């Protein structure tokens, strides 16, 4: 593969899988509710994995230097290929101080857009919306390294004389006979008297094409949920093995 897909796992999924041989994104590390550092730092990970920190527990009196030191030690001991700061609470000054401290570490760091502006580390972007062209989506970050979250997705866009609206996707199993090479999705069109519905779907095949195309924008790290993309990852490994053997 010309890209790396990390499968994001919870602590329970990692324990159940029993030492996966592929690099993962460990997404169970968070701010301690009882101290000033981090909780749930794993004892072992597959080499080359990403250590992820979320802010589901709000920042209180947490120590940026302590957290940076914990992550530095963990990344070294676990042979991680990088750290992801998956911070979703916007505008937290104390969270920004933690991000600033972690981004000074001698490891690749990816951070969500809310806290990426003041740092020169990679930006960790959410999945591309189905109706958005990738190049336009990446444009605000063209001078930055980008790590991209990927997901199987589907939606419906209804067009009326009054404008557009996004609706839930159509029933699973219905066909998507058309392909859009610009949006990396498949679609169907339902024309009615008062509206036109565009049903969009990004399945595993579209995801693979998207990730391969993203390399031309310098994007080579992708993250997807293990519970959703685990079988897809196995297919990618099988394709690589077949190419190598041939």
Q: Which residues does each PLM region occupy?
A:
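Glycan-binding loop/region signatures in secreted carbohydrate-active enzymes
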Residues: 147-209, 242
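Substrate-binding surface in catalytic domains of secreted glycosidases
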Residues: 80, 86-174
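A structural motif corresponding to the C-terminal end of an alpha-helix
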Residues: 45-47, 77-80, 104-107, 137-144, ...
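An active-site-proximal structural segment forming one wall of the substrate-binding cleft
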Residues: 62-83, 101
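Extracellular low-complexity, Gly/Ser/Thr-rich intrinsically disordered linkers
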Residues: 193-232
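Hydrophobic faces of well-ordered beta-strands that scaffold small-molecule active sites
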Residues: 3-9, 22-27, 47-55, 83-85, ...
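Aromatic-rich peripheral "rim/lid" segments of glycoside hydrolase catalytic domains that contact
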Residues: 227-246
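Glycan-recognition patch characteristic of GH18 chitinases/ENGases
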Residues: 1-70
């Amino acid at each position: 593969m010309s890209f790396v897909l990390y499968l994001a796992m919870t602590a329970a999924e990692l324990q159940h899988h029993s030492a996966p041989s592929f690099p993962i994104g460990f997404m169970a590390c968070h701010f301690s509710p009882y101290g000033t550092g981090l909780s749930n730092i794993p004892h072992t990970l597959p080499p080359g994995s990403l250590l992820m920190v979320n802010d589901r527990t709000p920042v209180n009196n947490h120590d940026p230097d302590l957290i940076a030191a914990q992550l530095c030690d963990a990344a070294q001991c676990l042979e991680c290929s990088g750290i992801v700061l998956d911070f979703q609470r916007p505008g937290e000054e104390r969270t920004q101080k933690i991000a600033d401290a972690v981004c000074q570490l001698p490891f690749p760091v990816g951070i969500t857009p809310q806290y990426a502006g003041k740092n020169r580390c990679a930006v960790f972007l959410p999945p591309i919306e189905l109706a958005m062209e990738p190049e336009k989506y990446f444009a605000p970050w063209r001078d930055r390294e980008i790590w991209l979250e990927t997901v199987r997705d589907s939606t419906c866009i209804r067009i009326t004389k009054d404008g557009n609206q996004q609706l839930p996707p159509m029933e699973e199993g219905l066909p998507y006979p058309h392909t859009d090479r610009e949006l990396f999705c498949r679609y169907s069109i339902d024309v009615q008297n008062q509206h036109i519905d565009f049903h969009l779907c990004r399945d595993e095949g579209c995801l693979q094409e998207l990730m391969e195309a993203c390399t031309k924008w310098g994007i080579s790290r992708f993250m997807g949920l293990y519970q959703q993309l685990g079988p897809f990852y196995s297919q990618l490994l099988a394709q690589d093995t077949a190419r190598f053997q041939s």
